[in-house]
């Protein structure tokens, strides 16, 4: 059932969401080849230059044919946030609408989709000294202990943040210590929702087994394409280290540990696939709470009929 209300003359925005390894890029490219849409990437790892294989980044040839915004905009030494993504995406949406085209936001970073659709409240800037202290406490006691502390002051945030998600635990505790208010309270205050009608399509595999097969196949393909060499080149840079957000991306942290001698290649494969499965599980949990979905599709259904479905939506049908 469609929840998007299309008014004549109101420019829409399209969302193409789904867990990892469900073919979102292929579907987005197919739409861009057939319809007047322009792709905006919604992926916290694709923003980084030099991280191509482990992110399944579209090839240079494909990007030349079908441009994607918000890919290769940062160096891996830099941090990126949901707030910055929202600002960048809104600017891109305005430009695409001004050109008479339709923005297609495609990816799997669910926090970015939420920030764009529902807005973000004003949050304090990062405090380097406080972050160093929290990292020191985590080194001494583990991120699980800090997650327990977060549960005491912001149970809502703790419920949605994985106990191993160091970056988000750190940020939630930082906000609490800087403001005396929980991240959840601040995020509910003063949000500005997206002002355009949204057509929202979600890709979801038919079964967990099929998704796991897709994930294993893709990770093996990444290894065959030179993923280890890609991380080795990044690891040689003196300004990059394992704790950076870019290097904590799924797959990259496992290859980094392999290069540190923590385990052998077969264990790398097992851990990389397991980490990707866990990532997909979190994405699916998030998606199941998503509201206003125009249609849920399997990858096969999307491949066979998504352009026609989106075309009907754009024509008001």
UniProtKB/Swiss-Prot annotation:
Is Magnesium included in the keywords of this UniProt record?
Answer: yes
InterPro entries in the cross-refs? Dimethylallyltransferase, IPT, P-loop_NTPase
The record's keywords, sorted A to Z, are:
ATP-binding, Magnesium, Nucleotide-binding, Transferase, tRNA processing
The record's Gene Ontology biological-process terms are:
tRNA modification
**Where along the sequence does the record put site: Interaction with substrate tRNA?**
109, 131
EC number(s) reported in the record: 2.5.1.75
Record has Nucleotide-binding as a keyword: yes
- Cofactor(s) needed by this chain: Mg(2+)
Q: Give the residue ranges for region: Interaction with substrate tRNA.
A: 43-46, 167-171, 281-288
Q: Where does ATP bind?
A: 18-25
Residue sites binding substrate per the record: 20-25
Write out the catalysed reaction.
Answer: adenosine(37) in tRNA + dimethylallyl diphosphate = N(6)-dimethylallyladenosine(37) in tRNA + diphosphate
The cross-references to Gene3D superfamilies, in alphabetical order and at most eight, read: 1.10.20.140, P-loop containing nucleotide triphosphate hydrolases
A Pfam family found in this protein is: IPPT
Q: Which domain of life is it from?
A: Bacteria
- Which GO MF term does the entry hold, naming one? tRNA dimethylallyltransferase activity
Cite the record's note on assembly: Monomer.
Function text: Catalyzes the transfer of a dimethylallyl group onto the adenine at position 37 in tRNAs that read codons beginning with uridine, leading to the formation of N6-(dimethylallyl)adenosine (i(6)A).
Please report which protein family the annotation says this sequence is part of: Belongs to the IPP transferase family.
What name does the UniProt record give this protein? tRNA dimethylallyltransferase
